[in-house]
Curated annotation (Swiss-Prot):
Expressed in leaf epidermis. Changing residue 115 to F: Slightly reduced activity. InterPro entries: AB_hydrolase_3 (IPR013094), AB_hydrolase_fold (IPR029058), Carboxylest/Gibb_receptor (IPR050466). GO terms for cellular component: cytosol; nucleus. Its EC number is 5.5.1.37. This is Catharanthine synthase. Pathway: Alkaloid biosynthesis. Component of iboga and aspidosperma monoterpenoid indole alkaloids (MIAs, e.g. tabersonine and catharanthine) biosynthesis pathway from 19E-geissoschizine, psychoactive compounds likely to be used in the treatment of opioid dependence. Catalyzes the conversion of dehydrosecodine to catharanthine. Catharanthine binds at residues 84, 305.
């Protein structure tokens, strides 16, 4: 029955225009997704090549390699895209373009994870997918080309050129939230082959933490709704430790499974002033007081979140260079 005869079919549970609508009848309408970009070799703009690799029936990744010399070993950069747990893709231009340029600038093997999206696949699906993808990357350690004959699920770029002593994990917004939860898990569970995460980047991390500063009604609605959409039955709701890292039952931040961490903050979100400064300040203070033994860097930019991905402004280029310098350890 269509909407002309059944008016209830157009009733929404969530109307987050201009991005996504979720209807009571179960339909999901994604109003904004950037164009799909196919795999390519020797990109004329950057010299980077990329391909899409299945990891399991539910998870895949886009793997990137820059122009390099034979036998050169490169850091491995695993990226988790943001966009509300429910939009975009590793294969679409918005995040793909960023990763492509980042791979060219930093000379890394890039692995951009294609995880399942809410609301079709509610959390913790994305958390599990990204852990599975990270374990897949780690499973390449110690292999050589001879291993490819018996391991059809392995990627030769990672085997031949990946330096597992320089494994980095990064994400933006909800992707940074996934990275945070992955770091917690990596501190408790071993990656395959004993691989360790050297460093991680949280770009505008998505946390919900009560603070003394009240968010405006509109900002609070738009900020918190993506968690409610992605994990409507989360134990504890917005006090679930996966979204509130200082909740009473949250894992100890001292257990982060990496040696270096860069937290990057911005002042604007799509030209709207960001109101999460206090949230991230509480998180950073909690991490500093936790006893975590790693090296923490904080970069606070008077810039819009989107500037990093468009690279159309000098500030966007400055943010890009700051993230790149962390990977280069400059």
């Amino acid at each position: 029955m269509n909407s002309s005869t059944d008016p209830t079919s157009d009733e929404t549970i969530w109307d987050l225009s201009p991005y996504i609508k979720i209807f009571k009848d179960g339909r999901v309408e994604r109003l904004h997704n950037s164009p799909y970009v196919p795999p390519s070799l020797n990109d004329p703009e950057t010299g980077v090549s990329w391909k899409d690799v299945p990891i399991s029936s539910q998870v895949s990744a886009r793997v990137y390699i820059p122009k390099i010399s034979d036998h050169e070993k490169l850091p491995i950069f695993v990226y988790v895209h943001g966009a509300g747990f429910c939009l975009e893709s590793a294969f679409r231009s918005f995040f793909h373009t960023f990763v492509k340029h980042f791979v060219a600038e930093t000379k890394v093997i890039g692995v951009s994870i294609e995880y399942r999206l809410a609301p079709e696949h509610l959390l913790p699906a994305a958390y599990e997918d990204c852990w599975e993808a990270l374990q897949w990357v780690a499973s390449h350690v110690g292999l050589d080309n001879s291993g490819l004959k018996t391991a059809i699920d392995k990627d030769p770029w990672i085997i031949n050129y990946g330096d597992f002593d320089r494994l980095y994990l990064a994400g933006d917004s909800p992707g940074a939230n996934i990275v945070h939860n992955t770091l917690i898990r990596a501190g408790k569970e071993k990656l395959k082959g004993g691989v360790k995460i050297l460093g991680a980047i949280l770009y505008y991390p998505y946390f919900i933490i009560p603070t003394s500063t009240k968010l405006s009604d509109d900002f609070e609605y738009n900020y918190t709704c993506y968690w409610k959409l992605a994990y409507p039955n989360a134990p504890g709701g917005m006090n679930n430790p996966m979204i509130n890292p200082i909740a009473e039952n949250a894992p100890d931040l001292a257990g982060y499974g990496c040696s270096r961490l860069l937290v990057t903050l911005v002042s604007m979100i799509s030209t709207t002033p960001d109101e999460t400064k206090d949230i991230n300040a509480v998180y950073i203070e909690a991490l500093e007081k936790s006893g975590w033994k790693g090296e923490l860097e904080v970069a606070d930019f008077d810039a819009d979140y989107f500037e990093l991905f468009t690279l159309e402004t000098e500030m966007g280029k400055n943010m890009f260079r700051r993230l790149a310098s962390f990977i280069k350890h400059e």
